[in-house]
Amino acid sequence: MSKKKKWLIGGAICAGVLVLAGIGAGGFYFFTHMNQVAVSSEPYAESVAVYMGGDSESGQTFSGKVEPEKQQKVYIDSEKGSIKKTYVKEGDQVKKGDKLFEYEGEDHSDEVEQANLQIEMTNLQINRLQKSITETEKKLKVAGKEEKNQLQDELDQTNFDLKTSQLELKQHQKELAGLTKNKGSNVITSKHDGIVQSVNQDIADGATGDQAAGPYIQIVSTGKYLVKSQINELLMDTIKKGSKVRVTLKTGGEGEWKGKVTSIGKLPAGAGEGEESESFADEEMNPQSSNYPFTILLDSHKGLEVGYHVNIEVMSDNADADTIKLPSDMVIQDDGEPYVWKADENHKAVKQPVEIGETDENDMVEIKSGLTPEDYVIYPDPAVKEGKQVTVNADTE
């Protein structure tokens, strides 16, 4: 039954004429409200909210896993030596730049001293060669023809030696910089704010095999949460970037969270370099087609924890979700000024001026201003008068 017919039935009821408009959903609506108004001549008021769009499910559901927006996995570099000290434990809150742990590191003091000596000696050599070049150039200006040839050969050799020494200097400086950098990199710090999710002490203690697999420390951000999932290529047209979703726990419960799709992978799951492909066992995966990862950013995550497995319901797009539309015959024109009847706080009929927009193919007219979703509107049958007591739909009040 259309919204317009619903109002016609309501008006007929209020006039005391009981008309059976149909069966099924229409008959159910009629008998549900008949007892409320059949004994009264009061007009009937319905909530404006029922004439708004809102979310509805598209029928597509997926499985996913809650993940932090940012996470840092720190692996041990065996070339830097053993762990000297760990500064954090599981559950600690850290800020960007905080120390996580420190390597014992190798003692490079002898190498640093040797590099500094080589740099100093090379600089002395460069200075000597530059002075020799200056003196030779002066002699060339006053030398005879035979002497000039000899001095030119000396000058060419000295210039060659100078360039060689300058290259040696750059090499020694590079070696020193490398030694200094390695010394500073012994301390590993956090890349962002977050919580230490785990510290694998077995790795620090020198464990091997399966116990040594994985990161030494994992940090998860405390900001926004994501949901990671996959979609089969045959269903790619059912979601897009910006699609709204509803998330619920697989374990059940009343909690639900809203979010939207922020990215859809251009490569199949697991095809990216270093990318792990997670299997969603309860999804119907077509072996003859590929699955693509997509990510959801949640509006809030209170009650969710990283690692939770969830259900994802894609909401259908609805451009009229926040638009109020009423049956066109509910809008009355008074000398070109449109108005509707609505119930005031005392459940009495009052005229409400409105600004109207276009009328759609279903004969529903857009109400641009004058009404809110909290208002209750009345079908304009002959019984409606200014100040008339009305019956408000208790189901939507």
Swiss-Prot record:
The domain of life is Bacteria
Q: Where does the record place a coiled coil?
A: 106-183
Q: Per the record, GO CC terms?
A: plasma membrane
Q: Does the keyword Aminoacyl-tRNA synthetase apply?
A: no
Membrane-crossing segments per the record: 8-28
Record carries keyword Cytoplasm: no
Q: State the annotated membrane topology for this chain.
A: Single-pass membrane protein
Q: Which Pfam families does the record cross-reference, listed alphabetically?
A: HlyD_D23
Q: Where in the cell is it found?
A: Cell membrane
Keywords on record: Cell membrane, Coiled coil, Membrane, Transmembrane, Transmembrane helix
UniProt family annotation: Belongs to the membrane fusion protein (MFP) (TC 8.A.1) family.
Q: What is this protein called?
A: Putative efflux system protein YvrP
Species assigned in the record: Bacillus subtilis (strain 168)
